[in-house]
Amino acid sequence: AHSVVSRQEILTLAGKPLAKEQFAGVLDQAGGTLLATVLSMLAPDGVAVAAGLAGGSDLPTTVMPFILRGVSLLGVNSVTQPSVTRAEAWDLWATHATRFPWESVTNMIPLAEAREIAPTVIAGATRGRVVVNVNA
């Protein structure tokens, strides 16, 4: 990834069966309207990987991205995977995740600030991830 796009920015295009092609691939942790919208934004032969449903389990989309752009939607089942498979996945992640500038999408806060930022996180108004350092 070379950039981070905010949820709010993506959701401005919600409801469009096809949007401007912006992504070759997407890893979606939200599901729901956010996943439906990024599907409409995939380039031809693009791939979306669904790995969560924090934004909802429904998928309000059309078949247009699938038949007009040939996009694929893959699901990740982490719940029933054996521990050895999970360990292999985490090892792969650790090997390849160092290539991404995580500091650009991560806000590290001490535990003492968690209550203060919680309403912002719940409202979905943060960009990237908020990591709470319980030792700080």
Regions found by a protein language model. Name each.
Residues 3-4, 73-75, 108, 129-131:
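Conserved beta-strand scaffold positions in the cores of enzyme catalytic domains, especially
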Residues 24-28, 51-52, 78, 103-107:
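Glycine- and other small-residue-rich loops at beta-strand/loop junctions that grip anionic moieties
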Residues 33-100, 134-136:
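Glycine-rich phosphate-binding loop and adjacent beta-alpha segment
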Residues 9-18, 33-38, 99-112:
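Short, basic, helix/turn surface patches
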Residues 8-9, 29-30, 54, 84, ...:
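Short beta->alpha linker loops
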Residues 1-33, 91:
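Adenosine-nucleotide cofactor-binding segment
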